[in-house]
UniProtKB/Swiss-Prot annotation:
Cofactor(s) of this protein: Mg(2+)
Domain YjeF C-terminal: 7-275
Source species: Bacillus subtilis (strain 168)
Record keyword NAD present: yes
Similarity annotation: Belongs to the NnrD/CARKD family.
Official protein name in the record: ADP-dependent (S)-NAD(P)H-hydrate dehydratase
Cross-referenced CDD domains: YXKO-related
Gene for this chain: nnrD
Organism ancestry: Bacteria, Bacillati, Bacillota, Bacilli, Bacillales
Protein task: Catalyzes the dehydration of the S-form of NAD(P)HX at the expense of ADP, which is converted to AMP. Together with NAD(P)HX epimerase, which catalyzes the epimerization of the S- and R-forms, the enzyme allows the repair of both epimers of NAD(P)HX, a damaged form of NAD(P)H that is a result of enzymatic or heat-dependent hydration.
Residues annotated for (6S)-NADPHX binding in this entry: 42, 104, 149, 216
Length: 276
């Protein structure tokens, strides 16, 4: 299967400029439902990725015990106490530019109830980690973006990992069409497949990303870029590209063994500037 690469030239042509006359409302408010008592860091990692990626304002809906752990590091966000639990009980009352749910959340029925309520919104929705399950998705205005690693793809589809890895692009494209979602199949040369049949490979990244938390950062980056890009496709593709490019810059100066996920967000401003 001949799948094109999303290249540096594509990124330069599609990354948005920051209008000098803009304000935070121009780029909208994003909602991140993430982080539990057992995995509090996921909310912080995704939040840092989002705040570095072009949004106007970020609301983090996380467990009450997680909030005081995050605020000293991410005071720029606002917080919705037990937000992901409350989203399971009722539909969202606020309007958001984009929503992400799943980093650091358990694989429970209540999380899937929160997913159901989130999907009633019109905006783009990212599902990651604990929000990924074998299910169907309603027809809606904004895209649904699934960000599985191979094990999560198996949980979603039943395709064994060893079989998936032989034909990554084919399976991602097939299931994107079947589920009518965007699928970001993470791994070496991440596959980004769209429900209309469009499919791309990402050329950036390296083994430094083979560490816990880097996927949470990517989810946050996609969330932020959905707020500053007009085209959701470009937002997803550019987020994946820059995420990998951050890892490449890291290994220009450090061992691939040593990257910590939060350092991707520290590196991102330098990488982004290269493409402006």
């Amino acid at each position: 299967m001949n799948v094109p690469f999303w290249t540096e030239e594509h990124v330069r042509a599609t990354l948005p400029e920051r209008d000098a006359e803009s304000h935070k409302g121009t780029y909208g408010t994003a909602l991140l439902l993430a982080g539990s008592d057992d995995m509090p860091g996921a909310a912080l990692l995704a939040g840092l990725g989002a705040m570095r990626s072009g949004l106007g304002k970020l609301v983090i809906g996380t467990s009450e015990n997680v909030i005081p752990l995050i605020v000293p590091v991410l005071p720029e966000a606002t917080y919705w106490r037990d937000g992901w639990k409350k989203a399971a009980d009722a539909q969202l009352e606020e309007t958001y530019r984009a929503i992400a749910i799943g980093p650091g959340l358990p694989q429970t029925e209540s999380v899937q109830q929160a997913v159901d309520h989130v999907l009633t919104a019109d905006c783009p929705v990212i599902l990651d980690a604990g929000a990924l399950a074998k299910r169907t998705y309603p027809k809606r205005e904004g895209p649904v973006i699934l960000t599985p690693h191979p094990g999560e793809f198996f949980r979603m589809t039943g395709v064994p990992v060893n079989e998936l890895q032989k034909k990554r692009a084919e399976y991602a494209k097939e299931w994107a069409a079947q589920l009518q979602t965007v699928i970001v199949l993470k791994g070496n040369q991440t596959v980004i497949a769209f429900p209309d049949g469009d499919c791309w490979l990402n050329p950036t990244g390296n083994g430094a990303l083979a560490k816990g938390g880097t996927g949470d950062t990517l989810t946050g980056m996609i969330l932020g870029m959905l707020c500053c890009h007009e085209d959701p496709k470009h937002a997803v593709l550019n987020a994946v590209y820059l995420h990998g490019a951050c890892a490449e810059l890291w290994t220009d100066e450090h061992s691939a063994h040593t990257l910590l996920a939060h350092e991707l967000s520290d590196i991102l401003p330098r990488v982004w500037k290269r493409f402006e």
